[in-house]
Regions:
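Active-site-adjacent beta-strand anchor residues
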Residues: 122, 143-144, 225-226
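Phosphate/pyrophosphate-binding betaalpha-module
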Residues: 143, 147-210
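Internal helical hairpin/lid segments
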Residues: 234-325
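Metallocofactor- and cofactor-centric catalytic cores in central/energy metabolism, strongly enriched
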Residues: 1-137, 151, 155, 159-164, ...
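Short, surface-exposed amphipathic charged segments that create phosphate/polyanion-binding patches used
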Residues: 78-81, 133-140, 184-189, 211-213, ...
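A conserved active-site cap/scaffold subdomain adjacent to cofactor or substrate pockets
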Residues: 172, 190-259
Length: 387
C-alpha cells in the first residue's frame, strides 16, 4: 500500500539504526548520560512500542513520553462536569469513545450510561449535530476534546449549527493547545530534554513555524515526525544529527503531509469560533496559561457551560496514581506503584491507561516488560516475556 509499506521496510530500518548508532558516538553528552528525546504525540508513543523501536536503539537514546494524548490530560473535575451534564433531564451527551472510560471522582461516563444517562459514542461532532436535528425535543451536547487536530471539525460543526439554526445543539469545550504545553515542559526544572519529535497531526493544522521558539529560545532541536517506523527512525536520526553538529532547528520529516504554513482554512475556522482561555487545568501538569480554548461570545448560544449548570470543581487525582509524573517524563509508566496491578486497561485508575495513545497503555500492551521483576516499584503478574 502506497505511503505505508515503503515506510515499514525492515532493511531500511536496519540501515537507519546503524546510522543512529554512529551519530550517538559523535555526541559528547551521550557519553555522560542517555540522550532524552521527548515524543510529544501519544500516537508516536504507541507506534514506538507497537513496532519495537525502543528495542532497536542504543541505551544512550531514551524516549521521554510527552503529554500529547488529550484524553490522558483531562482533569478529573472536567470528567465529573461531563457526567453532571449527561445526567441532566432531556440531555443526550455525545463523546468520542476513549473519553467514555476516563475515571471521574466517582464514576466514568460509561458507568453513568449504565445508570441511565443518555451517553452516546460518536465518531465526529457532525454525528452529534445530526442527532440534534433528529431529536429537536432533546438537548444534544458534544464533548469537544483534543488538540488543534480536532478543533477544526468542532469549529465547523458549530458554524454549521448556526447556519442551519439548530438551537438544541451545544458544545462542552475542552480543546487544548500544544505550544503552551511544550513551553511549560521546557520551563520545568524536573526535565533536561535534548530534543523533540514534534507531533504530526497537530502540525498538519498549525504548520511548523509555531515551533521556532523551541530552537530559537531554548536551543533544542525539534523534528516533525510521521507515524510509521521509518518516519520515527528518520526523525530521530535528524534530531541526533542536529545534536552531533551542535545546532538547533525546526525540521520537517513529515513534509509529505505537513506544510510549513499549516492549513489556513482549518486555522480560520478555529479563530472564528474559539478564543484562548487565560489558563486551563491539566491532569498531572496543573494550570497552564493560555493552554485551552473556549467558545467566543458570538457563539455563546452553543456553549454548554453557559447554557447548563456545570459544577466546575477542582478534584485531585487519587494519591496512588502517578499519571502526573509520567506525563512530565519524571518516571516511566512501569515505575508507577499501581502499574499492571490495580491499574490495567481493563480496570484503569489513571487516564494514561485508558486511551490507546496513553503511555501506560502502550507500555502495558507493547512494552515487553517483565512486571514480576518490578515488585516494589510496580505490582502485577508476569503477563509477557521480558526482552
Amino acid at each position: 500500500m502506497k505511503y505505508i509499506d515503503e515506510f515499514r521496510d525492515p532493511v531500511k530500518a536496519r540501515i537507519l539504526r546503524t546510522e543512529i548508532n554512529q551519530l550517538v558516538e559523535r555526541i559528547e553528552t551521550a557519553r555522560r548520560r542517555p540522550l532524552q528525546i521527548m515524543e510529544v504525540c501519544g500516537g508516536h508513543t504507541h507506534a514506538i512500542f507497537r513496532y519495537g523501536l525502543k528495542q532497536m536503539l542504543p541505551p544512550a537514546v531514551e524516549f521521554v513520553h510527552g503529554p500529547g494524548c488529550p484524553v490522558c490530560v483531562l482533569p478529573m473535575g472536567r470528567v465529573d462536569d461531563c457526567i453532571a451534564l449527561a445526567e441532566q433531564p432531556g440531555v443526550i451527551f455525545t463523546t468520542f469513545g476513549d473519553a467514555m472510560r476516563v475515571p471521574g471522582s466517582q464514576k466514568t461516563l460509561l458507568q453513568a450510561k449504565a445508570n441511565g444517562a443518555d451517553v452516546r459514542m460518536v465518531y465526529s461532532p457532525l454525528d452529534a449535530l445530526k442527532l440534534a436535528r433528529e431529536n429537536p425535543q432533546r438537548e444534544v451536547i458534544f464533548f469537544g476534546l483534543g488538540f488543534e487536530t480536532t478543533m477544526p471539525s468542532t469549529a465547523m460543526t458549530v458554524l454549521a449549527a448556526r447556519r442551519e439554526g439548530v438551537r438544541n445543539f451545544s458544545l462542552f469545550c475542552n480543546h487544548i493547545t500544544i505550544i503552551p504545553t511544550i513551553k511549560a515542559i521546557l520551563d520545568s526544572p524536573d526535565l533536561h530534554l535534548d530534543g523533540f519529535l514534534g507531533p504530526g497531526h497537530v502540525s498538519l493544522v498549525i504548520g511548523t513555524r509555531p515551533y521556532e521558539f523551541i530552537a530559537g529560545n531554548y536551543h533544542k532541536p525539534i523534528v516533525i515526525a510521521g507515524f510509521e517506523p521509518l518516519d520515527l527512525l528518520q526523525a530521530l536520526w535528524m534530531v541526533l544529527k542536529q545534536l552531533a553538529e551542535g545546532r538547533s532547528a525546526v525540521e520537517n520529516q513529515y513534509a509529505r503531509v505537513v506544510p510549513p504554513e499549516g492549513n489556513s482554512a482549518a486555522l480560520a475556522a478555529i479563530h472564528e469560533v474559539f478564543e484562548l482561555r487565560e489558563f486551563f487545568e491539566w491532569r498531572g501538569l496543573g494550570s497552564i496559561d493560555h493552554s485551552g480554548v473556549r467558545i467566543r461570545e458570538a457563539f455563546a448560544g452553543f456553549d454548554a457551560e453557559k447554557r447548563f449548570r456545570v459544577p466546575n470543581l477542582k478534584i485531585a487525582d487519587p494519591k496512588s496514581c502517578q499519571c502526573g509524573e509520567v506525563l512530565k517524563g519524571v518516571i516511566k509508566p512501569h515505575e508507577c506503584k499501581i502499574f499492571g496491578a490495580a491499574c490495567t486497561p481493563e480496570t484503569p485508575l489513571g487516564a494514561l491507561m485508558v486511551s490507546s495513545e496513553g503511555a501506560c497503555a502502550a507500555y502495558y500492551n507493547f512494552g515487553r516488560i517483565d512486571i514480576s521483576g518490578l515488585r516494589g516499584n510496580a505490582g502485577g503478574t508476569d503477563r509477557r516475556a521480558a526482552v
